[in-house]
């Protein structure tokens, strides 16, 4: 993903990896965005340099100059794993895009950003295609892993692009969604115009190539399943199944309760505001556990809808949503709410990112047709269709947005 590994000319790491969520380079990325300008960054990087790999490399140059002088190549963590297996140092366009080192306009490494940071572009590894023979297992790796010598490495990707691959999400208008502790909406587009430098990130999707500029628009929601888990942990003896059963007895809109589920830290889609969780409009003479359970599921679903509206306002089409058969998408209330509000179906697949990556290793030269057919035939579990009583969901969502806006206004 967006971390940094640096090695010397012997291929030995020069320091511990700086992982994706390490925030030490935030100020560096923000200053670069300010000096380089929004137009250049958004038209060519589709992102702010932010706290990503290039900015982390600049941090090493500024704070650990003796280490920086010894760098032979920088890599993403996934590139380093491939190197340890094959002995070959290389990367992909997809990986460079996740490090915000890819120029979409010129379709090459963003050497101008490296130049701005004072980083020699020769430190960038050789670029290989995402679906290609990227090296083979060598003897030492074979002894340590049990993999046979000569087994080729033919695929690599970050977690969200790979999750999208596992869910058969490749084309404009297709969306991969996940609803664990946090939520992720990953929408595919061929439109490289964006005005969202912070709320949305853009990465070259796994099938991005010279002939197919497939971009993944990534929006994260910190407060998702953690909200429902918190309710379960504070409801004595309740399982998710019992909670869902009680929630299903409550009408759409939870009789006026709104749960604003943003209690897992600052939310990027709220411009990094940390507003916490709010349970609004409780009537102590009327509302029950079932109301709380349903309003929590609806509140999380409404936050997904809020995120999708941000994506749609930034040139993303949303024609179908695909998700794994786990976590929040096992809840009919949650899935029906999202499907009905967005007006499109949600397809549920019995797969994981690990299965997707294993299958992708058999894809060469971007020939994805048979790969996609197998997913559709073998993994599809069910489809949630938009319900006919959409107005009830829209009324509840409108009330939720009003409650959210009131909280945001008070945070100014």
Residue map of PLM features:
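N-terminal cofactor/phosphate-binding cores enriched in small/glycine residues
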Residues: 1-5, 11
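Hydrophobic or amphipathic alpha-helical targeting/insertion segments
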Residues: 9-12, 31, 35
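Short, charged/polar, Gly/Pro-enriched secondary-structure boundary elements
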Residues: 12-14, 192
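Carbohydrate-associated surface elements
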Residues: 22
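Active-site core segments that coordinate phosphate-bearing ligands/cofactors
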Residues: 26, 33-90, 95, 100-111, ...
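Short beta-strand to alpha-helix junction loop
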Residues: 103-105, 130-134
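A conserved helix-loop-beta module that forms one wall/lid of the active-site cleft
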Residues: 117-132
């Amino acid at each position: 993903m967006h971390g940094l590994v640096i090695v010397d000319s012997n291929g030995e790491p020069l320091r511990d990896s700086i992982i994706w969520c390490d925030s030490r380079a935030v100020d560096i990325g923000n200053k670069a965005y300010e000096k380089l300008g929004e137009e250049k960054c958004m038209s060519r990087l589709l992102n702010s340099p932010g706290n990503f790999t290039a900015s982390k490399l600049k941090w090493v140059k500024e704070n650990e100059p003796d280490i920086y002088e010894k760098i032979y190549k920088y890599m993403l963590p996934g590139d380093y794993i491939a190197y340890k297996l094959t002995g070959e140092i290389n990367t992909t366009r997809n990986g460079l895009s996740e490090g915000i080192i890819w120029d979409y306009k010129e379709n090459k490494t963003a050497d101008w950003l490296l130049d701005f940071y004072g980083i020699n572009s020769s430190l960038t590894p050789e670029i290989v295609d995402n679906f290609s023979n990227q090296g083979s297992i060598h003897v030492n790796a074979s002894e340590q892993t049990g993999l046979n010598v000569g087994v080729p490495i033919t695929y690599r990707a970050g977690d969200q692009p790979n999750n999208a691959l596992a869910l058969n999400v490749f084309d404009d208008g297709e969306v991969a969604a996940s609803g664990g502790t946090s939520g992720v909406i990953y929408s595919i587009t061929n439109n490289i115009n964006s005005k969202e430098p912070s709320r949305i990130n853009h990465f070259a999707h796994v099938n991005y190539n010279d002939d197919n500029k497939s971009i993944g628009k990534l929006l994260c929601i910190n407060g998702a399943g953690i909200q429902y888990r918190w309710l379960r942990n504070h409801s004595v003896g309740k399982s998710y199944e019992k909670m869902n059963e009680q929630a299903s007895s409550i009408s759409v809109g939870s009789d006026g309760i709104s749960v604003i589920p943003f209690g897992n830290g600052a939310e990027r889609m709220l411009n990094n505001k940390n507003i916490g969780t709010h349970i609004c409009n409780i009537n102590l003479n009327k509302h029950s556990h079932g109301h709380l359970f349903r309003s929590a599921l609806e509140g999380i679903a409404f936050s997904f809808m809020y995120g999708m509206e941000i994506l749609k306002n930034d040139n993303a089409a949303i024609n179908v949503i695909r998700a794994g058969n786990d976590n929040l998408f096992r809840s009919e209330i949650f899935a029906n709410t999202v499907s009905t509000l967005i007006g499109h179906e949600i397809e549920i697949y019995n797969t994981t990112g690990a299965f997707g990556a294993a299958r992708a290793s058999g894809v060469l030269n971007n020939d994805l047709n048979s790969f996609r057919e197998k997913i559709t035939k073998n993994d599809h579990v069910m489809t949630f269709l938009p319900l006919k009583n959409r107005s009830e969901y829209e009324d509840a969502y409108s009330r939720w947005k009003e409650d959210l806006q009131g909280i945001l206004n008070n945070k100014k």
